[in-house]
A protein has these predicted regions:
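Active-site nucleophile/metal-coordination loop of metallo-enzymes that catalyze phosphate/sulfate
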Residues: 13-160, 164-167, 193, 201
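Beta-strand elements within well-structured catalytic alpha/beta cores of enzymes
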Residues: 3-17, 87, 225
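A broad, structural surface signal
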Residues: 8, 45, 109, 113, ...
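Structural motif
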Residues: 7, 85-86, 144-146, 188-190, ...
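Extended, H/D-rich, highly charged conserved domains that either
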Residues: 159-160, 167-232
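A general structural signal for short secondary-structure junctions and capping/turn motifs
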Residues: 1, 75-79, 135-139, 178-182, ...
Length: 233
């Protein structure tokens, strides 16, 4: 069968069951889609039509208009970056570091040196809104950088747009990206997280967010398509 176009859509973190190595990361019982379905009625007629919900039990449905399956990852690690690499044809044994107890002093000292700003936060927080509302007032008062991480291999830097302009925050994150490529740290992504608002009602600015990921270690499917004169957007 020949296709004229391929649309690749990624619903990041919408899993349909735990991976075989879930125990290694404390993710036993993970099933984002399944747990959502347990709690609420999803109105997703188009996704349902192509078998999205059928992936939960891999049951057959004659009304489904597409092929569906579950893929088992081979790449090491559990973060988004490794998963995206694998979807694009890169098999990698590289594992990016995670920092569940915060970042080592050496990283923080380096960030303070290259930015000239004090670091606050330095903890693992999976909800960015929580940490900006916890530390946002202090950031406003002192012009500090809120640095934190999540369960993934990332280093997130939050700052209020009225204190540190988005362009400046991006410059900081580019510099941080460079120093966190060291083997002993190897952070998968550095993420700029500007926010706006007033004390008690801070809001993340999605338009100013910018991710600085480690570049793919080799060519991807997209590169191969492009080199063979297929348009890639």
């Amino acid at each position: 069968m020949k296709y004229k176009r391929v649309f690749l859509l990624v619903l990041d973190s919408v899993g349909v069951g735990e991976a075989s190595d879930a125990e290694k990361y404390g993710d036993q019982g993970a099933n984002t889609l399944g747990h959502i379905v347990e709690k609420t009625d999803l109105f997703i007629p188009n996704l349902k039509k192509i078998g999205f919900l059928n992936t939960l039990n891999m049951n057959e449905d004659n009304e489904v208009e597409a092929y569906y399956t579950i893929a088992k990852p081979n790449n090491a690690g559990k973060d988004s970056l490794n998963g995206h690499y694998e979807m694009m044809g890169i098999e990698s044994n590289i594992t990016f570091k995670t920092f569940n107890d915060g970042f080592p002093t050496e990283i923080l000292d380096s960030i303070e040196y290259i930015t000239g700003r004090r670091i606050i936060g330095n903890k693992c927080c999976n909800n960015s809104n929580d940490i900006i509302n916890e530390l946002g007032e202090k950031e406003l008062n002192y012009g500090s950088l809120i640095v934190y991480t999540s369960a993934d291999s990332d280093l997130q830097v939050a700052a209020h747009e009225d204190v540190i302009p988005v362009s400046t925050l991006h410059e900081y994150c580019e510099k941080i990206r460079a120093i966190t490529l060291k083997e002993e740290w190897r952070v998968g992504r550095v993420i700029a997280r500007p926010f706006t608002g007033k004390v008690g009602n801070f809001k993340l600015s999605n338009t100013g967010r910018k991710d600085y990921a480690v570049k793919p270690p080799e060519k991807t499917i997209l590169d191969n398509l492009n080199e063979n004169n297929y348009n890639v957007i």
